[in-house]
Amino acid sequence: MTKKPGGPGKNRAINMLKRGLPRVFPLVGVKRVVMSLLDGRGPVRFVLALITFFKFTALAPTKALLGRWKAVEKSVAMKHLTSFKRELGTLIDAVNKRGRKQNKRGGNEGSIMWLASLAVVIAYAGAMKLSNFQGKLLMTINNTDIADVIVIPTSKGENRCWVRAIDVGYMCEDTITYECPKLTMGNDPEDVDCWCDNQEVYVQYGRCTRTRHSKRSRRSVSVQTHGESSLVNKKEAWLDSTKATRYLMKTENWIIRNPGYAFLAATLGWMLGSNNGQRVVFTILLLLVAPAYSFNCLGMGNRDFIEGASGATWVDLVLEGDSCLTIMANDKPTLDVRMINIEASQLAEVRSYCYHASVTDISTVARCPTTGEAHNEKRADSSYVCKQGFTDRGWGNGCGLFGKGSIDTCAKFSCTSKAIGRTIQPENIKYEVGIFVHGTTTSENHGNYSAQVGASQAAKFTITPNAPSITLKLGDYGEVTLDCEPRSGLNTEAFYVMTVGSKSFLVHREWFHDLALPWTSPSSTAWRNRELLMEFEEAHATKQSVVALGSQEGGLHQALAGAIVVEYSSSVKLTSGHLKCRLKMDKLALKGTTYGMCTEKFSFAKNPADTGHGTVVIELSYSGSDGPCKIPIVSVASLNDMTPVGRLVTVNPFVATSSANSKVLVEMEPPFGDSYIVVGRGDKQINHHWHKAGSTLGKAFSTTLKGAQRLAALGDTAWDFGSIGGVFNSIGKAVHQVFGGAFRTLFGGMSWITQGLMGALLLWMGVNARDRSIALAFLATGGVLVFLATNVHADTGCAIDITRKEMRCGSGIFVHNDVEAWVDRYKYLPETPRSLAKIVHKAHKEGVCGVRSVTRLEHQMWEAVRDELNVLLKENAVDLSVVVNKPVGRYRSAPKRLSMTQEKFEMGWKAWGKSILFAPELANSTFVVDGPETKECPDEHRAWNSMQIEDFGFGITSTRVWLKIREESTDECDGAIIGTAVKGHVAVHSDLSYWIESRYNDTWKLERAVFGEVKSCTWPETHTLWGDGVEESELIIPHTIAGPKSKHNRREGYKTQNQGPWDENGIVLDFDYCPGTKVTITEDCGKRGPSVRTTTDSGKLITDWCCRSCSLPPLRFRTENGCWYGMEIRPVRHDETTLVRSQVDAFNGEMVDPFSAGPSGDVSGHPGGPSQEVDGQIDHSCGFGGPTCADAWGHHLH
């Protein structure tokens, strides 16, 4: 039985049975009802009524309301909407009846109505302004005018207009103007938000609001990523964290491509740790360190020590930004040379980009179908951007016919924020350098530049291209002279200084010019490509809105990741670039060598401090007053044995004054391990114990430990089972990694022959040792020594040793030996044969019939992988075979390129094993590599220069070089194997094919060149010495066959050897007489022509030769088939039918050599007709560099 709560409820403080209604404010209740309806909750009739209200007012209903509308059943909706229709009909009838009654009223009421209408017009006129636009009435309104009907009195009566635009704000620069069409009675408005009932008018209003900014486009401009700068830089690049992401991607790629090495690194990391946490950390660190060895060269100390030989009079320095060099030489004071600042002034503005724009004064002119094309008068103003189009017109928007009407919209473009690019002129760069002497520097004067200058111990000076040399007086220390080459610093032609907001960056020139943003030049005020920061929205019948994109500053900053940040105001401080100087020390002298030794007691004013560069600074206080006197200071290994160890950086330190308690700073370099710094003599001697971490052997073993941690990751090389040597290479790679560092530290100064002999000696001692442990130690050490002495291990980059005529790429050696022979230890390999086979298949389907190799190493690569490619093609049912023919003459170019693909062919173990023993059968279709040009595969259908070096790998007998497909099409040679150097009076341009040597003797001139083969790519400007202002007609080795565009590639009396014997093998170009011949200079000699061999077809020697204005000794080419002279040197009176001439022509087939306009068949020593002479030998009608000859330079050899 349920108990009712009636009784007990009476005695409660609050009677639950007699509670009143909740006290809610009426407006709050109305708000709750409306909000619930907007959310789609409530009676169906109310929901439909609210949707009808939104429909009549041209407002957008909420998503929840639309969802409820779609959920209503059809019968229920039709029932309510029919009742709405009946109610609307009743209202229409009532209005019609009211209109008839008003017409029957008298004149007094009519006058009252007229006065009321006039008052309304006057009230509206207070807010609305009327003017003219395009010959029609223009009304300017604000957001208060759109609530009711706008009545405009005209000569034809009242013109009532309705404006239902939702973007009306207050008047500002952001205005929009468009037409309100006339709608006849009974036509509903369609695709218009403004209309009138009597005549068309234009409406204008501002779009600004006081609560938010103007409407802007959601679209953004795509800005290409700048990428990492190629400059060596002392400061961090902008947004350098992007490198971390790329490095993680590289690590992942390395693990996928090197599963065996990754497993080995993980095993080593697991063995190193004593618990699971340490094991995980060590494993992650090893995997992260592994690919770093081939990432790039990182870490560079900002202080280097240079030791001059005894009696040296000069030393070459290379100063970089924020670097310091300490120069020590026997019998000379120690100098510190510091690059203080690199500054460029008077930057020239190149181009400005707009990254934030505003759009104002929008106007639209529309026409009905068949009434002509719309034309906006503002199109004539260059500050406006216009766009024409078509819209749907008809009765609902003021046109009598249905169809497409013309529309023309214009908007004014103005730039709010811009990024400015400026170029640096080489002549405006100045280098501020300071020189400091390690003399009697007191602690008060240390770092005090003005005090050191007063003591003639320091000097600052500025080096500019106009003043590259300076002599400094250093008081009693003598004087020092610096001859510098400012042009060897930053390549100003490749970079711009770009200022975005308050930040400035050093950006690549090509990236800057390719930015997809509006731009203008300094001499113009008009912006180009303005539409990139504007968006014309979808056009309506008579209206089209235009909005500007938001600020692109954030996108620019993100794209600039990797660029170098610089400081710019009126000048820019550079942190990149270098300055090469020759420091002449012949007039430097030590000060105080005749002083006596100090006899009183010294004390350490402060404890000796480590400088971080392996040296220690000691501040001494001298109690005596017998100065100036020399300081007896030495570093010893033991106090019982006073034999000096280490060395003094401050040469001949002395106390300069006679005042007591004077303080002096001395810098010295103690040995590794424990030592004592001893100051003074006899019983007044003091000492300080010093420990320098590490040792010579310890440093070697620490390097070995790092090598073990990097563990066989010299390049991004795959775990390669493609050849039988792959497994052995990986073992050798591990040996190199673990012991390579110690090997270079301990034996790096010896020749490889000495290293090999030491290894053989240790092996012999191991074989003959009786004790097993000693025997194993000798055998292991000797084996590692022999292996590391004979193998070629890899690094990245190329270096040149001019004196030994040696070029190293990685640690592989490319030697030009004394007998003029090339010995190369390089082996080119594709990234993977599977992907290369797919690339070949794809290229063949696209109409590429073959390839031309760029170099002999690429040709050898095709030969090496031919069979494996053919097996892959056969296994994947592709009727195609790769055929490699012997190259003929020089390596020619071709117009097409191979394109990259992510797809790969697959091959099983059985097919791979079979490919080692048997070559596959030839298919019906062929892909031809090199060989002579044939009708089946002409050069115009071949690909060339499609590969570039990705990384240097490892090999026991050769350095592996991994190739990948180029992403861009270029004619330049691969810069990864190019090295350039200048040392003393010798300059060299070199790669794996060329050794081009120039010497300085009054002027720079080409001395000799040795060619492993002749190729048809162009030498990149980034690896060219002294390349500014060079005319290609003066280049002896033509630019079209990889001749450097350098002033080192010139020689007085000779022009470009475009018709030299470049199709011969084993070419050596030098300046000497061919055996058994003589050359005379005479004006009666013939003009330039193709190079001629000094022996005829039958082997007869031609002894007499001449030239018009060449320099002697003459230019000659030594080849496997004989000796040839240059184009300026002609045979004297010889039967031309027996001459052997060069068939090479570096120009287009329709052109002639611009330096020899005589008869083409006349190559002998008589003049050959009237001609105009220039420099005694040049003869051409077009004039040097004239319009008809301008294109002669730059055609590739085909």
From Swiss-Prot:
GO terms for cellular component: extracellular region; host cell endoplasmic reticulum membrane; membrane; viral capsid; viral envelope; virion membrane. The chain crosses the membrane at residues 110-130, 254-274, 280-294, 747-767, 774-794. The keyword Secreted applies. One of its GO terms (molecular function) is protein dimerization activity. Residues 2-109, 275-279, 768-773 are cytoplasmic. This is Structural polyprotein. Genome polyprotein: Specific enzymatic cleavages in vivo yield mature proteins. Cleavages in the lumen of endoplasmic reticulum are performed by host signal peptidase, whereas cleavages in the cytoplasmic side are performed by serine protease NS3. Signal cleavage at the 2K-4B site requires a prior NS3 protease-mediated cleavage at the 4A-2K site. Residues 37-72 are annotated as: Hydrophobic. The record marks 105-106, 127-128, 219-220, 294-295, 794-795 as: Cleavage. Residues 392-405 are annotated as: Fusion peptide. The transmembrane domains of the small envelope protein M and envelope protein E contain an endoplasmic reticulum retention signal. Disulfide bonds join 297-324, 354-410, 354-415, 368-399, 386-410, 386-415, 484-581, 598-629, 798-809, 849-937, 973-1017, 1074-1123, 1085-1106, 1107-1110. Residues 2-15 are annotated as: Interaction with host EXOC1. GO terms for biological process: clathrin-dependent endocytosis of virus by host cell; fusion of virus membrane with host endosome membrane; viral translational frameshifting; virion attachment to host cell. Residues 1152-1177 are annotated as: Disordered. Residues 106-127 form a propeptide. It comes from Japanese encephalitis virus (strain Jaoars982). Residues 131-253, 295-746, 795-1198 are extracellular. InterPro entries: Env_glycoprot_M_flavivir, Env_glycoprot_M_sf_flavivir, Flav_gly_cen_dom_subdom1, Flavi_capsidC, Flavi_capsidC_sf, Flavi_E_Ig-like, Flavi_E_Stem/Anchor_dom, Flavi_E_Stem/Anchor_dom_sf. Glycans are attached at residues 142, 448, 924, 1001.
